[in-house]
UniProtKB/Swiss-Prot annotation:
Segment forming the signal sequence: none
Keyword list, A-Z: Cell membrane, Decarboxylase, Lipid biosynthesis, Lipid metabolism, Lyase, Membrane, Phospholipid biosynthesis, Phospholipid metabolism, Pyruvate, Zymogen
Gene behind the chain: psd
Catalytic residue list: D89, H146, S252
PTM summary: Is synthesized initially as an inactive proenzyme. Formation of the active enzyme involves a self-maturation process in which the active site pyruvoyl group is generated from an internal serine residue via an autocatalytic post-translational modification. Two non-identical subunits are generated from the proenzyme in this reaction, and the pyruvate is formed at the N-terminus of the alpha chain, which is derived from the carboxyl end of the proenzyme.
Identification of the protein by name: Phosphatidylserine decarboxylase proenzyme
Site positions (Cleavage (non-hydrolytic)): G251, S252
Amino acid sequence: MDKIKVGLQYWIPQHGLTRLVGKLASAEAGGLTTAVIRWFIKQYNVNMDEAKHSDPKHFKTFNEFFVRELKDGARPIAEGDAVITHPADACVSQFGPIEDGQLIQAKGHNFSAQELLGGDAKLAEEFQDGSFATLYLSPRDYHRVHMPCDGTLRQMIYVPGDLFSVNPLTAENVPNLFARNERVVCIFDTEFGPMAQVLVGATIVGSIEQVWAGTITPPRGNSVYKWDYPAEGDKAVILKKGEEMGRFKLGSTVINLFVKNAIAFDESMENGKPTVMGTPYAHQQ
């Protein structure tokens, strides 16, 4: 059965299905929208008590519900300049060292930092022998992504690709899953060196947005595109730890890359363990 499920991933019209779902999720359908939201809350056991607006009727579209804000104080940010915090409510998929330019996708499956970063060999070299973590956002999670530390945006890269579903089954069976799916790479300069925060798309992830640039995808491109940002001035993007940096409209995965000897992961990190945005993720070395 698993082989059939994975095989279907190669045959379904990934981009067409995602466009359709994106349009439906953005449609204002009144009572139908409310009914779908109520079903989703029940189906995935979504905690609406922590949402700024807990009544499903508040949301005009499903996407508005999906990227719902939380109440003030719902996610306190761990204090301390050396404390790096979780960027999202998620589940730890994999984490550890980047060895020979390779990241672990699942048992028996690796992928390269260079491919993840859109084929940029020079950029990948910055993270040689560094550390990585892959965090999977489930449907029930809060889908805004925040900064794990203070950072100044250096570059944003759009990398076109497939839209395979992202879950343990595909991670174990689809080679180079995270390096072949569509993604937006954000490179920040921090006190401990460069850090990458990569937002990876998936089937029915209708949109990836950034707070400084709005919607990056759709429309979906056919080639890698890069935006460079200044470190100072009106066009500089400087974000504090805990500030929102992006969001998924129907979610997927966040991958962080850290340079060599920059951080040590918090002792609470464990594959398969849920994460809470703002709690300790790693510590500067």
